[in-house]
Amino acid sequence: MKRPSGRAADQLRSIRITRNYTKHAEGSVLVEFGDTKVICTVSVENGVPRFLKGQGQGWLTAEYGMLPRATGERNQREASRGKQGGRTLEIQRLIGRSLRAALDMSKLGDVTLYVDCDVIQADGGTRTASITGAMVALADALKVIKKRGGLKGGDPLKQMIAAVSVGMYQGEPVLDLDYLEDSAAETDLNVVMTSAGGFIEVQGTAEGAPFQPEELNAMLALAQKGMTELFELQRAALAD
């Protein structure tokens, strides 16, 4: 089996995390997984949603979108259609769930964190790139809150979060699928993990024949290998 990109089966794409990419948001990152590029920002606002008022904890929510020409052909903006699509809603809920797992909300204070992930170029793995990049933007936003005199109850960041795709391509497990691989894969799996080694989410779909337990285990092992590298890239980015 030869991958279209020439990568080894267990090889990530070239990944770059550029911090402070925009000047207004408390945290901002340009994350690049090969040719997939996503701008991730985290904005801090005082107050929490009504369902959390008086409970002494903060909140995090996420939104996701793609520029019309992030793909090979122009897509109509969802705003001009008047509603978000099912895929968009699914992905932004995944991003929010994943990043909330990084935080102790009781230490966040009476604030809401708004995570915005905007895909400017898509070549597969946009949701996993969004989570991995937004995690770094979130860490930066927490530093800003602390500088402003917040986080009196301690650091709310419990652990780092990252995500990666794996799949069965031409009968073999591969790591970090690009668009060509994703569109032809027999199985596509998105995995979200913590830096402590726990799983937050495993989303898997067989596009053709069902995948077998041993194939699932092989894909998860590849994902764990990729996570080790992703967490190191996050740490290196935050150390700059």
Curated annotation (Swiss-Prot):
GO BP term, pick one: rRNA catabolic process
Signal peptide: none
CDD domains found in the cross-reference section: RNase_PH_bact
Any Pfam family hit: RNase_PH_C
Binding site for phosphate: 87, 125-127
Keywords for this protein: Nucleotidyltransferase, RNA-binding, rRNA processing, Transferase, tRNA processing, tRNA-binding
Catalysed transformations (reactions): tRNA(n+1) + phosphate = tRNA(n) + a ribonucleoside 5'-diphosphate
Enzyme class: transferase
Domain of life: Bacteria
UniProt xrefs under SUPFAM superfamilies: Ribonuclease PH domain 2-like, Ribosomal protein S5 domain 2-like
Any one GO MF annotation of this record: tRNA binding
EC number: 2.7.7.56
PROSITE patterns: RIBONUCLEASE_PH
Family assignment from sequence similarity: Belongs to the RNase PH family.
Function: Phosphorolytic 3'-5' exoribonuclease that plays an important role in tRNA 3'-end maturation. Removes nucleotide residues following the 3'-CCA terminus of tRNAs; can also add nucleotides to the ends of RNA molecules by using nucleoside diphosphates as substrates, but this may not be physiologically important. Probably plays a role in initiation of 16S rRNA degradation (leading to ribosome degradation) during starvation.
Subunit structure: Homohexameric ring arranged as a trimer of dimers.
Descriptive protein name: Ribonuclease PH
